[in-house]
Amino acid sequence: MPSKAYKTFQKNLNQVNKLIETYNHELERNSGRGKKSLDHLTRAGLIFLCSSFEVYVESVIYETGNFITRKIYQPKKLPMEAKKTISDAVKKEKNDISPILFYDDWKEYYRKLIYYDIKKLNTPKVQNIQQLFKNYFGISENEID
């Protein structure tokens, strides 16, 4: 069964394809004016495609975090990198009782960390995506291309 992230990406990709169809139609209709006159469609398609990919990546990361928290019952079963990421976040907390809050509901804490980190993503650059997969799922850069 496809994930919600994939379904959303497919829907957005259909919109990109419609922009491409419009571009091709306008190019045929106004062939004398050249591609420069359709620059706005090219930019719109590219921006929409990039933002769709960013939303897809964010959704995949969040869905993966949710999947992990449904399957794992103890934080010690998380990948080492995820444990380090959580530990670093707890240490940086200004609230002195954060370790207790983490202990009470580590799954929610883990999901919130993922949520806040993906909201900071802003651009789907490879190194940023790889870092998120490494930090939360223990998947190294070599495993993602």
How should these model regions be labeled?
Residues 1-47, 59, 71-81:
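Charged alpha-helical initiation segments
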